[in-house]
Amino acid sequence: MASVILFPAIDLKDGLAVRLEQGDMARATVFNRDPAAQAAEFETLGFRYLHLVDLDGAFAGKPVNAAAVERILETVSIPVQLGGGIRDLKTVEAWLEKGVTRVILGTAAVRDPDFVKQAAKAHPGRIVVGLDARDGRVAVEGWAETSDIAAVDIAKRFEDAGVTAIIYTDIARDGLLKGLNLDATVALAEAVNLPVIASGGLASLADIEALLTPRAKKLEGAITGRALYDGRLDAREALALVAGR
C-alpha cells in the first residue's frame, strides 16, 4: 500500500483561512488572514497534498472564494483537492483547468448523482465524493441540512463510476479535537471498493498511529485542521510518523 497521506486543510470564509466547530459558520475561528501564505507554509513543512474547502461556496451552491483559491494554486506546487459549491460540470472543468488536481463533490453526490458519475467518467481519477455525516446520515448544503440517507448507501452508488476516493467526515467531531471516528470510517472503507479518507476530529499523533494499523489499511489518509493550527499536532512529527511506517 502507498503511504498514508496527511491532508492539511484550509477552509476559506470571507477570503480568510478559518476553522469551524461542527460545521457552524457562526463558530468560525480565523487562523490565517493570508490563505496562500498558509498553503506555502504547509508545503514547506513537507505536506504533499492540500485540502481546500470554499465554505461560503458550500452554502451558496457556487464558488465564492475563487480569488483565494487561485492565489493558493499560484503559490504552491503540490497537488490540491478542492470542495465547496461545485455543483455542475462547467465549474468542475473550470477548476481543473486552473490547476486543481482533484475536485470534491458533496451535496451533488446526494442531489445529483448522475452529474457526479458524468464528471467522474469525463475526468477519471480527479473526482472525489465528500460524505459529511451526522450519526451516519449524510448532511448537505454546507451541513445545513441532514438527509435520511446513510453514507454507505451513497458511497456504494459510486463504486464503479470512476470516482477516485471518498472523504468521510464525522460532523459531530469536526473542529472539536475529539479524535477521528475511526470505527465508522473503517466500516465504510470495508463496505465499499473505494479508498476512503478520514476527516473530522483528528487531534494527536495517536490518531495518526491508528491510521497506520492493519485495520485501517483501506484508508488513503486523513485530513487534519484545527490540531495543526493550534499546535496540538506537530507537523514534522506527524509527517515523520507517516514516512516511517
Swiss-Prot record:
Coiled coil: none annotated. The keyword Repeat does not apply. Pathway: Amino-acid biosynthesis; L-histidine biosynthesis; L-histidine from 5-phospho-alpha-D-ribose 1-diphosphate: step 4/9. It catalyses: 1-(5-phospho-beta-D-ribosyl)-5-[(5-phospho-beta-D-ribosylamino)methylideneamino]imidazole-4-carboxamide = 5-[(5-phospho-1-deoxy-D-ribulos-1-ylimino)methylamino]-1-(5-phospho-beta-D-ribosyl)imidazole-4-carboxamide. Gene3D superfamilies: Aldolase class I. The keyword Isomerase applies. This is 1-(5-phosphoribosyl)-5-[(5-phosphoribosylamino)methylideneamino] imidazole-4-carboxamide isomerase. It comes from Xanthobacter autotrophicus (strain ATCC BAA-1158 / Py2). The lineage of its organism: Bacteria, Pseudomonadati, Pseudomonadota, Alphaproteobacteria, Hyphomicrobiales.
